[in-house]
Amino acid sequence: MKKSDKKKLSGEIIKRLAKEYPDAKCHLDFNSPFELIVSTVLAAQCTDIRVNMVMVPLYKIKYKSPKNIIKDGEDNFRENIKSINFFNNKAKAVLSICKTVVDKYNGQIPQTMDELTSLAGVGRKSASVVMGNCFGKNDVIIVDTHLKRVATRLGLIENENPEKIEIELKGIIPDNEQFHFSMRIGELGRQICKAKKPDCEGCFMNDICVSAFK
């Protein structure tokens, strides 16, 4: 599909997503950029539900700031998150993030892509989640498994590599729509366009989707 055709298609998709999911929100529960960046790192290859179950009580009782995690220590933090996949590596990453944030940023989570991705365990996807949800940055594409699957099925992207997908979508989605597009297409992926059994019959995109009913 030509880029001009993809732009036209994306415009219609953006309108439909906005109508269907006007208030799409992050599925990780958080009250601060600190909580979201920690939960985002912990959510890699784990469910948001599990991370919320483990971390929400801990944020309220023990971990109200990066300094609290540093003070508690890596061993205790690891023990508290052991029901989360890959807890050993994630505990190391979170402790590293907390130390960097305290030492370099006066305890505040940085706001730019370069600064965020310099933190341990934080890639472009996690950085985009924090930038969009906490700092009001609309010009971020969150390339997660749902966006990748749904955007491919809709015919918007042809790449497999996350960074190439990001570049491709930034070329056809207006800057001020990119974050909302990411959140809303994620909802479509969770609720209708599922990995194994997409509900094409019940999908509000089935008349413009190149993969519908296939």
Where in this protein do the model-derived segments appear?
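Catalytic cores of DNA base-excision repair glycosylases
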Residues: 2-214
